[in-house]
Amino acid sequence: MKHLPVQDKQVFNAIKDERKRQQTKIELIASENFVTEAVMEAQGSVLTNKYAEGYPGKRYYGGCEHVDVVEDIARDRAKEIFGAEHVNVQPHSGAQANMAVYFTILEHGDTVLGMNLSHGGHLTHGSPVNFSGVQYNFVEYGVDKDTQYIDYEDVREKALAHKPKLIVAGASAYPRTIDFKKFREIADEVGAYFMVDMAHIAGLVAAGLHPNPVPYADFVTTTTHKTLRGPRGGMILCREEFGKKIDKSIFPGIQGGPLMHVIAAKAVSFGEVLEDDFKTYAQNVISNAKSLAESLNKEGIQLVSGGTDNHLVLVDLRSLGLTGKVAEHVLDEIGITSNKNAIPYDPEKPFVTSGIRLGTAAVTSRGFDGDALEEVGAIIGLALKHHEDEAKLEEARQRVSALTEKFPLYKELGY
């Protein structure tokens, strides 16, 4: 950076401090990742200056011939990655992508079947504090109390009983593979639309390491960050028959001008996904999550469902006598960033919780391998089991520092 340090030292210093935080801490928030320098360059380009309401070839502003090229590249690459018939890359977020699907096919008060937030769902899947739960009549399904896997028979029974217009699959804190074929069969049985929110697993789907929902779902939404390792944003994939309605729901329905600099960054990240080494990255994300899970098990720490099939691990802290709120703070103090998270049938309040959620997408981008994740699990065990012992916590800090120094981040940024 050449101009920002001179123009606005306050903002520059905050950015520099965040750069330092990312370098010196271990990032285990499952919804975060580290984009490449190329993605950051695209997002910081002159495209931030351009208004482009509408879609390629049908804009409400002149001078869009070059941003049209960029948006077409993003759409075509997404189609190639996921085998989708129609793609909209304009949603500013995953939440807005979900909203657009709802606005396309639902009326106020329609019944929708979605996953309980405390069982691993998402706010936009019917939480009463979210527009989705206010606007529509959401019925919740969840996981089996014993296995902590999605209870597909419960999904079917509720679908038959409530006859939803839409069934939503996908989660923000579910560590197991989702059977989209079963969901499709249930949706067909009751005549419902089927939508999948694959925000957390999109990168794993892209690499062929998780079943692809596109052949089964009428609509698939996702964020473009998380395991997909792009800029923060959203995307919708759907059958061609719904394409025009989806596009209208985004613009002019719920958004104005698209963020063309972000769409450029999406295009670049999609290009990276199409490269051969992305599959290796995604394989490492999963193997690292399994290494972390095994290490935590060795520490005697209980995991929801006993382990993981994807990029995240959900920790049940009750046997340690800790809440998620306390554990998040303890780990942050030693240099590990995580988030408190509800577990299925959680007795604690949402701002307290009985669990923490850990993910390996970001540390894998940084170069952490299985041995490093085994060490991370051991450090977490040390800190949580001795959270009131300052000597043990200092040992944990030193071990975190050794790992972050071994795997540097953004070495060429220059600030």
Swiss-Prot record:
It is an enzyme of class 2 (transferase). GO terms for cellular component: cytosol. It is found in: Cytoplasm. (6S)-5,6,7,8-tetrahydrofolate binds at residues 117, 121-123, 241. GO terms for molecular function: glycine hydroxymethyltransferase activity; pyridoxal phosphate binding. The modification N6-(pyridoxal phosphate)lysine is found at residue 226. Pathway: One-carbon metabolism; tetrahydrofolate interconversion; Amino-acid biosynthesis; glycine biosynthesis; glycine from L-serine: step 1/1. Keywords: Amino-acid biosynthesis, Cytoplasm, One-carbon metabolism, Pyridoxal phosphate, Transferase. It catalyses: (6R)-5,10-methylene-5,6,7,8-tetrahydrofolate + glycine + H2O = (6S)-5,6,7,8-tetrahydrofolate + L-serine. PROSITE patterns: SHMT. Its cofactor is pyridoxal 5'-phosphate. GO terms for biological process: glycine biosynthetic process from serine; tetrahydrofolate interconversion. Its EC number is 2.1.2.1. The keyword Ribosomal protein does not apply. The record marks 225 as: Plays an important role in substrate specificity. Disulfide bonds: none annotated. PANTHER family: SERINE HYDROXYMETHYLTRANSFERASE (PTHR11680), SERINE HYDROXYMETHYLTRANSFERASE 1 (PTHR11680:SF35). Belongs to the SHMT family. Catalyzes the reversible interconversion of serine and glycine with tetrahydrofolate (THF) serving as the one-carbon carrier. This reaction serves as the major source of one-carbon groups required for the biosynthesis of purines, thymidylate, methionine, and other important biomolecules. Also exhibits THF-independent aldolase activity toward beta-hydroxyamino acids, producing glycine and aldehydes, via a retro-aldol mechanism. HAMAP family: SHMT. NCBIfam families: PRK00011.1 (NF000586). Homodimer. This is Serine hydroxymethyltransferase.
